[in-house]
Amino acid sequence: MKLGFEIQRALQGLLNKAAVDGGAYGHLIQHFTRHRLPLHVLQLHARIVVFSIKPDNFLASKLISFYTRQDRFRQALHVFDEITVRNAFSYNALLIAYTSREMYFDAFSLFLSWIGSSCYSSDAARPDSISISCVLKALSGCDDFWLGSLARQVHGFVIRGGFDSDVFVGNGMITYYTKCDNIESARKVFDEMSERDVVSWNSMISGYSQSGSFEDCKKMYKAMLACSDFKPNGVTVISVFQACGQSSDLIFGLEVHKKMIENHIQMDLSLCNAVIGFYAKCGSLDYARALFDEMSEKDSVTYGAIISGYMAHGLVKEAMALFSEMESIGLSTWNAMISGLMQNNHHEEVINSFREMIRCGSRPNTVTLSSLLPSLTYSSNLKGGKEIHAFAIRNGADNNIYVTTSIIDNYAKLGFLLGAQRVFDNCKDRSLIAWTAIITAYAVHGDSDSACSLFDQMQCLGTKPDDVTLTAVLSAFAHSGDSDMAQHIFDSMLTKYDIEPGVEHYACMVSVLSRAGKLSDAMEFISKMPIDPIAKVWGALLNGASVLGDLEIARFACDRLFEMEPENTGNYTIMANLYTQAGRWEEAEMVRNKMKRIGLKKIPGTSWIETEKGLRSFIAKDSSCERSKEMYEIIEGLVESMSDKEYIRKQELDEAY
């Protein structure tokens, strides 16, 4: 009613050609902006200029809102600069515009200049809850979390200004802390809030889910159910379904689904995708597919959820069949496909799918690159790794820790250790993941001295190792054979690092002792293990025994391996070769006959070359290729040339065939 009166006053003033107060003009500009009448607003602003009306904060805020909605920030800033004495109204109008357009650094700059200005001493010019919420939104949306000092400054301002009791500010603080992986600070803010709403609960539950704290996510959901003031909504259960799917907790997820139905939560597309993703990840693929088939509306996330589920359970053909049905393929679906193929060791298809993705016009992101790089590593494609590295630098993806560590792994495993070190040196995020990657790189090359040096540097800089880091360090000693140093680190795991040795660490120690020629010590070490040895432990002993030619210990290890992994052809091959080297031909033949009875065949050697049409693989003794006759003729010619020039002995050539 009041707004209508103000508009009437402003219009009357226009008819009388008289200057009216700024408040009336402000309401009129707000009305025209809301109804998308930009020409009317421009005419009003022109009239304001003609009559030399100095816009107050209310009128200025409406003009700023109009111009920023039109993406005319220069005019908005001009209006802002004309304000004689600014207050929260005008500052907030510009802050809201900056954050809504994701102009986060402009928002930071404006806020810092505001709290440092002379007008800040006035109560009317102090930031309010809207101002703080805008800055927190900007902090949450910005990937450069080195802005931590500004975040601490804002948090301090919140406490000093008494804004910590404001629910919107509290929610903003939770969102910021969860997005920069500081879940402990987020929980502290949540616990200290005197008033909470559904958004508070959802922000905390989502934070736990996204940070991988799945049990805490489920506990927070149960606490929300126990709170009579709030009920979970669609946003809540999406986060919980994601946590249940990632932790393969089918039972808890079923309870969530049941509660969702009881509370009549509306099933929109996002929630349907979350439900399908949960069932697919937990292995209930038939039910997930039934829900998928019933959906009238699907998007790329829907397809990606089913494809990821198929891939996670090794159903590659089913995933590819569904993928081929899609008419429009989004980036998330491409990523699900490429990631799934990589996890199932279909590395040739990964590289070819990536090429097809580029051909179709999809632009790869960090998820794509971190899935592609392991396949390039497997295919010994260092050139491809360098090309992806260059692409990552050009597109700013080299700041992503998973892309960075995949590049380090690619370079290290393909012999470019200097390149791996350079990538690490340029890494802005020296997190534990990055340290572990470079330590592993030196471990692969058997450089235990460099691995240990990096391990010490990491600790001096305040980064504590985890179980994966310690596995990398121990594996370095396995390559170098320094059993004393390995034993020292292994013995200090619990006392110094508070990490209980796992089966991977025991396997590394067996490998260290075996490669150092201490097979008896390795046998004794296994006998004293507090956990049952897995195939990896016996495999380490077998490899050590095969190197030293200890037939009895090798046979002892193989007997266990035949029980644990009867279809692993590598174990049979090693044992048969050991018997052959010892001249025990009958036993070697018995092992080979056992393979035949089970239906096992030695996995043939494979090599690759990259052509313009993609990656081409070649299998040893394969004659199925239509040009195999031509290829073998070329090989025979090369062999004859090598033999004539005495590059290799004739006997070695015969054995090669």
UniProtKB/Swiss-Prot annotation:
PPR repeat windows: 21-55, 56-86, 87-121, 128-165, 166-196, 197-232, 233-267, 268-298, 299-333, 334-364, 365-399, 400-430, 431-465, 466-501, 502-536
GO BP terms, alphabetized: RNA modification
Single GO MF descriptor: RNA binding
Region described as Type E(+) motif: 613-643
Type E motif: annotated span: 537-612
Record keywords: Repeat
Top-level division of the source organism's lineage: Eukaryota
PROSITE patterns referenced in this protein's UniProt entry, alphabetically: PPR (PS51375)
Alphabetical list of SUPFAM superfamilies matching this protein: TPR-like
Gene3D superfamilies associated with the record: Tetratricopeptide repeat domain
Similarity annotation: Belongs to the PPR family. PCMP-E subfamily.
PANTHER family per UniProt: PENTATRICOPEPTIDE REPEAT-CONTAINING PROTEIN, REPEAT (PPR) SUPERFAMILY PROTEIN, PUTATIVE-RELATED
Protein name per its UniProtKB record: Pentatricopeptide repeat-containing protein At2g37310
Gene: PCMP-E49
